[in-house]
Amino acid sequence: MRKFLAPVLFVFTAAALLTGCKKNAESSLTPVTLNEVAHSIFYAPQYAAIELGYFEEEGIDLTLVNGAGADKVMTALVSGDADIGFMGSEASIYTYIQGDDDYAVNFAQLTQRAGNFLVGRTPEADFKWENLIGKKVLGGRAGGMPQMVFEYILKKNGIDPTKDLSIDQSISFGLTAAAFTSNDSDYTVEFEPFATALEQEGNGYVVASLGKDSGYVPYTAYSAKKSYIEKHPEIIRKFTNAIQKGLDYVNTHSAEEIAETISPQFKETDTEKIAIIVDRYKEQDTWKENTVFEKESFELLENILEEAGELDTRGPYEYLVNTEFAKAAAEK
């Protein structure tokens, strides 16, 4: 009887120890809530970091929330419902100028190109922006990066956004593609996967990349309240390390490999379509090599805000951007 019980007790004890170790390992992870502006393949490095376990490697138990808009992400950040916000950096400038003492500080930049595309009714191999003169376009929310970058491109090409064409800004973010299939607009400005979906359904054709035609723009970045960064620098450091690993991955792997990795984040989209979208973003040099938010990029962003009539007073780069964690992550 003893001979039988000994191995059984050993197995039971070993299992208990392993379970205990697992629980201890899990409890050692620091919970962090990240509120993102949208859930899009445009942010592939972030999802690669999630799916490949880079946050866990850094000791972070990440909860991801889709804020559906930069204004909502900033609200969550300011209220404390989110630890870290991921959005266009214009939101942090607005908050600072409004006089908030505990303002949002950008500590890591992810994308360096606009992620939206101009979709028309017919193919236009030799598209020129002047083709939009006299046309109706489904645009974005006033003051948001998609709309401001669109207007910035129009002005660069000598087109007045308020006089030379009609821009419909009445449709909510994420619903313009559906509206485009049933209304009389000539063009729509779309993120992925909506641009590719319109093409595959035969309801539209990508005629221009706003990312290519606007140039390098600090489109989306990670930010946290000044007090949070001061209180939890180690969390910010580890979070930035995980994002850097995600960037390293997408910059060294094929579109097909990336699509396979991030596919659990986009269950409604088949892997082949994800690969097409990733390839489109890779081709326009969407993702940075590192997360350092350079001063020149910040100043370009404020130029765009000023030209859009959304900024009367500039926010100081030295207050609104912290590159300490990004530089350290890039050197690892």
Briefly describe each language-model feature range:
Residues A91, F173-F266:
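Pocket-lining segment of extracytoplasmic ligand-binding domains
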Residues L301-K332:
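Conserved C-terminal helix/tail region of periplasmic/extracytoplasmic solute-binding proteins
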